[in-house]
């Protein structure tokens, strides 16, 4: 993934100026008026918004100051029916800081109706800035901004979305920014378009006119804004007209832990009626029921699927918890220490923080033992990394919050045993064959219980699920340990005191199916914690302290990544309304919200909130595809080794 570049913005006569491209970000004659003339009128958006019944999708090259987005959003909120939604996808390779963004918008929007919207955008703007996709639900949920930070062509190639309705081709002029306006970029614009997708751009350059014209866009040259003589607008006149998407109105979610609750929330807040079925007598009764947990990203020497997914998941978690009710879920201030507990991790930290793809200090920064102890509030053994965005949360409370939305029906104490598909609907049946619920689609979020379900699939995709035992210890706070300010992570973790006790976690035991508390494992957890934080060395009073613990079983996959996507029949690989979100492992707090959003986006036909390469790494069929690829490679090697005859 490409690195983000510093725009090195300057301010000239009160306007933001790019010394890299030697031009201002918006017109001196009036930024909002320019947006309205070039992009809104150029795409005839006011009249199109008024006719929109469902979702209108816009793609933009060059987010810049966010001015185009805000002026467009204001017009949409004014002109579109209340039932309509706007999905605005914008790419930016040189993103402004939040400070510069605010200054630019404060300057540009004086006296304009969109000024009232700028505060919400600024508050939600990513900080610190990292490469990747960043989804933001704004303005009462009617507008979704999907911000793609990175090189434009690369980011668009990662975008998985239904065809867009219109394009804002902004960015600096081709003469000043020739790398942007490439044939590869135009091909991505074409890929993400359908017949009658429109575009508008301030530029009338031949490279734009020819690049789009060769791909089937009808081009019209028309009057530009203010002193600019010409601009271009047009539409795609080839290809197929996309079929109207009819998202399901109802869904069944099986599983009442973090994963199922997240899917429920993501569907319900988009208007889907959800029936959530849980076998236990309460939500979050099993692995999601820990009283406290730590949401922390993974740091790797180079960006990997795992590290990028944890960054995306943590960003989404911050957005989710910024909504009403989120304050009650968060314990203390953000931040966590991760100590380098062996040479391998120390080398990994070193490369991840100081290499060419180094993360910004606001996200992760190295700390020596003295700095680590100061951050922790007590003495810790060794240095490591401080993650400023990490969170300590109440998982059970988060699960309950996610299922509190309107349109959610809870069925507790019901076990789904069999799934049927009849007349285009999914049915969930219990062991006696009684129908528990029916809906247009069904999501399995019941961890390893997926393996016990009877499904109407002729050749179901094999899911290599692994059941992993985890035991954590509740350690009563003492006078010294109570000073711990942030969680300390190593190959385990210690949380600050909550309700008079710390949580020390957690074992990760494959193939151990014992559900009883193991005192020896409690002792090992305690000894390991004391080795990193001496304040935890005292042995608690009482002979039964090792039994102040909790055991639960996580579900993970063979490659330690979640399994999220459409669950297809290998005999009929068309999507049939059956989906899965499971195998979150020990990272349920980080992954569950992201998996829930991705599942809802797949079901409802929305632009995906993570890169296509990441969503592909989560698909249920990935294990089968890898096995086929491995077998083909083995056959090829065998063929090459075969001796020649004759």
What are the residue ranges of the model-derived segments?
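Rossmann-like AdoMet
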Residues: 1-56, 73-110, 621
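S-adenosyl-L-methionine
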Residues: 104-158
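Helix-loop-beta segment of a Rossmann-like dinucleotide-binding subdomain
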Residues: 112-113, 117, 301-302, 327-338, ...
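Short beta-strand to alpha-helix junction loop
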Residues: 200, 304-313, 343-345, 384-400, ...
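Active-site substrate-recognition segment that forms the wall
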Residues: 239-270, 279, 287-294, 299, ...
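Dinucleotide-binding Rossmann-like beta1-alpha1 core, especially the glycine-rich loop
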Residues: 292-375
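A conserved short coil-to-beta-strand element within the FAD-binding core of flavoproteins
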Residues: 412-426
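C-terminal catalytic lobe of FAD-dependent flavoproteins
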Residues: 539-646
């Amino acid at each position: 993934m490409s690195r983000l570049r510093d725009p090195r913005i300057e301010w000239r006569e009160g306007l933001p100026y790019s010394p890299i491209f030697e031009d201002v970000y918006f017109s001196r004659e009036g930024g909002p008026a320019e947006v309205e003339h070039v992009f809104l009128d150029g795409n005839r958006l006011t009249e199109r918004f008024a006719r929109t019944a469902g979702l209108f999708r816009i793609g933009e090259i060059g987010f810049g100051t966010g001015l185009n987005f805000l002026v467009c959003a204001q017009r949409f909120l004014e002109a579109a029916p209340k039932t309509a939604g706007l999905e605005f996808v914008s790419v930016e390779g040189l993103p402004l800081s939040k400070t510069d963004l605010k200054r630019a918008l404060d300057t540009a929007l004086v006296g304009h109706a969109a000024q009232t919207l700028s505060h919400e955008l600024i508050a939600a703007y990513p900080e610190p800035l990292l490469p990747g996709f960043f989804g933001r639900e704004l303005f009462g949920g009617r507008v979704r901004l999907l911000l793609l930070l990175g090189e434009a062509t690369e980011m668009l190639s990662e975008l998985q979305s239904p065809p867009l309705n219109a394009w804002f081709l902004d960015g600096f002029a081709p003469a000043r920014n020739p790398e942007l306006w490439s044939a590869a970029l135009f091909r991505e614009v074409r890929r993400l378009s359908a017949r009658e997708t429109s575009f508008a751009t301030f530029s009338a350059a031949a490279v734009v006119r020819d690049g789009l014209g060769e791909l089937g866009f009808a081009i019209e040259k028309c009057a530009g804004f203010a002193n600019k003589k010409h601009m271009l607008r047009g539409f795609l006149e080839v290809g197929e007209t996309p079929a109207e998407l009819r998202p399901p109105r109802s869904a069944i979610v099986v599983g009442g832990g973090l994963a199922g609750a997240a899917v429920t929330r993501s569907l319900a807040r988009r208007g889907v009626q959800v029936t959530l079925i849980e076998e236990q007598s309460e939500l979050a009764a099993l692995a999601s029921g820990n009283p406290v947990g730590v949401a922390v990203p993974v740091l790797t020497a180079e960006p990997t699927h795992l590290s990028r997914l944890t960054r995306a998941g943590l960003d989404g978690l911050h957005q989710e918890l910024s909504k009403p009710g989120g304050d009650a879920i968060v314990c203390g201030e953000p931040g966590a220490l991760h100590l380098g507990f062996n040479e391998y991790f120390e080398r990994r930290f070193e490369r991840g923080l100081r290499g060419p793809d180094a993360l910004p200090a606001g996200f992760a920064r190295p700390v020596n033992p003295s700095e680590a102890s100061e951050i922790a509030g007590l003495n810790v053994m060794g240095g490591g990394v401080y993650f400023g965005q990490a969170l300590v949360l109440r998982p059970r409370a988060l699960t309950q919050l996610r299922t509190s939305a309107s349109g959610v029906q809870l069925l507790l104490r019901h076990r789904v045993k069999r799934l049927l598909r009849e007349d285009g609907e999914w049915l969930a049946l219990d062991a006696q064959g009684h129908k528990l619920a029916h809906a247009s689609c069904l999501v399995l979020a019941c961890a390893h219980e997926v393996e016990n379900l009877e499904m109407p699939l002729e050749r179901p995709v094999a899911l290599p699920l692994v059941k992993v035992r985890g035991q954590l210890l509740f350690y009563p706070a003492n006078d010294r340990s109570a000073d711990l300010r942030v969680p300390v992570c190593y190959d385990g973790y210690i949380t600050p005191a909550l309700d008079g006790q710390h949580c020390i976690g957690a074992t990760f035991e494959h193939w151990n199916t014992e559900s009883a508390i193991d005192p020896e494992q409690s002792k090992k957890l305690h000894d390991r914690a004391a080795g990193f934080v001496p304040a935890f060395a005292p042995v608690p009073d009482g002979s039964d302290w090792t039994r102040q613990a909790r055991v639960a079983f996580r579900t993970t996959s063979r490659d330690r990544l979640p399994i999220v996507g459409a669950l297809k029949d290998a005999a009929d690989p068309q999507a049939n309304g059956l989906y899965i979100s499971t195998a979150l492992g020990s990272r349920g707090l980080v992954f569950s919200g992201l998996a829930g959003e991705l599942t809802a986006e797949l079901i409802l036909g929305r632009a995906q909130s993570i890169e296509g390469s990441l969503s592909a790494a989560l698909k249920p069929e990935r294990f089968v595809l890898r096995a086929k690829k491995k077998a083909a490679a083995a056959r090829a090697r065998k063929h090459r080794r075969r001796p020649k005859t004759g």
